[in-house]
Every structure is written in structure tokens, then in C-alpha cells.
């Protein structure tokens, strides 16, 4: 079976007339075939106490995602988005249009110095993975007043 990613012929607004003239078509085609490169969007913010990573993983269950820290302080978010299969086993379904990707994904982030990699925590809620990497407490310099003689 061949899946065509173009629009409905009866709807002229959904047809991409410039598809053949697209200079980035090869790159887009590669991105469609390699979801690991394109489909995991991650935000990284720094708070006074932690680095917080938020990843959109729609359709991924908690048991399909993995969070690891490699030696050298590299945070790895990986997993696999399962392909929707024929659930009743009759195989009488026919796909007309497929845009949602499936397959393995992985994102890697080098953590900065001072990240407490032994205290990383992760949670998932409604397809959003949140990874919190606490920061080492910065010691405020203690000032000692020196009397000036003379």
C-alpha cells in the first residue's frame, strides 16, 4: 500500500502545486522518514534552583519513554512512539492519510557544570514529559571586615 501525503484533489486549497519545485523537498522527505531528527520538541529553561526540560510526547505512554544521564553529564530523552495497528486483527482497515509519525526518537543535552545528575527527576502528564535537574547550591562569598590600622 502506498500513502500519498498530498491534499484532497476536490479541495484546491489543500493541494501543494509547488511540491515539485520545492528545493527543500529532499530534506523534508528525509525528516519524514527519520522522526528521530524532527519530532521531539523540547524546551529547556533554567531557574535559580534547577534546569527544567519539557518535551512534548503526544501519544507516548510513560513506559515508552526513557530518561537517562550518561557519564560526562549528558541528559538523554529517548523512547518509541508506537505505530497504530489494526486492533481487531481483521486487517480490513485502509489508511487514507498519515501524518503522525511513529518510531524511535532521541534527544541529547549536555548539562552544564553544577548540575546534580544524581538527583534528576522526571514526570509525565498528558503527553508532556518534564525532567528536572537540580543545580548545586552556590555558596555566597562570606565577607570578613578587615580593620584598617593607622
From Swiss-Prot:
Give the subcellular location: Cytoplasm
Keywords tagged on the record: Cytoplasm, Stress response
Domain sHSP intervals: 31-150
Question: Where is it predominantly found?
Answer: cytoplasm
Q: Which GO terms describe its biological process?
A: protein complex oligomerization; protein folding; response to heat; response to hydrogen peroxide; response to salt stress
Record's Pfam families? HSP20 (PF00011)
Molecular functions per Gene Ontology: unfolded protein binding
Q: State the signal peptide span.
A: none
Induction per UniProt is: By heat shock.
Where does the source fall among the domains of life?
A: Eukaryota
Q: Which GO terms describe its cellular component?
A: cytoplasm
Q: Which family does it belong to?
A: Belongs to the small heat shock protein (HSP20) family.
Q: How does it assemble?
A: May form oligomeric structures.
Q: What is the name listed in the Swiss-Prot or TrEMBL entry for this protein? A: 16.6 kDa heat shock protein
Organism placement in taxonomy: Eukaryota, Viridiplantae, Streptophyta, Embryophyta, Tracheophyta
Amino acid at each position: 500500500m502506498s500513502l500519498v501525503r498530498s491534499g484532497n484533489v476536490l479541495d484546491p486549497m489543500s493541494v501543494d502545486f509547488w511540491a515539485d519545485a520545492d528545493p527543500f523537498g529532499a530534506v523534508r522527505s528525509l525528516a519524514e522518514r527519520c522522526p528521530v531528527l524532527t519530532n521531539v520538541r523540547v524546551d529547556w529553561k533554567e531557574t535559580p534552583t534547577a534546569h527544567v526540560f519539557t518535551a512534548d510526547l503526544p501519544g507516548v505512554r510513560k513506559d515508552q519513554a526513557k530518561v537517562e544521564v550518561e557519564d560526562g553529564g549528558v541528559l538523554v530523552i529517548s523512547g518509541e512512539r508506537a505505530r497504530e495497528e489494526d486492533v481487531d486483527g481483521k486487517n480490513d482497515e485502509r489508511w487514507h492519510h498519515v501524518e503522525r509519525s511513529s518510531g524511535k526518537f532521541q534527544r541529547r543535552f549536555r548539562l552544564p557544570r553544577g548540575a546534580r545528575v544524581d538527583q534528576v527527576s522526571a514526570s509525565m502528564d498528558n503527553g508532556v514529559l518534564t525532567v528536572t535537574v537540580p543545580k548545586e547550591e552556590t555558596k555566597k562569598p562570606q565577607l570578613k571586615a578587615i580593620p584598617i590600622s593607622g
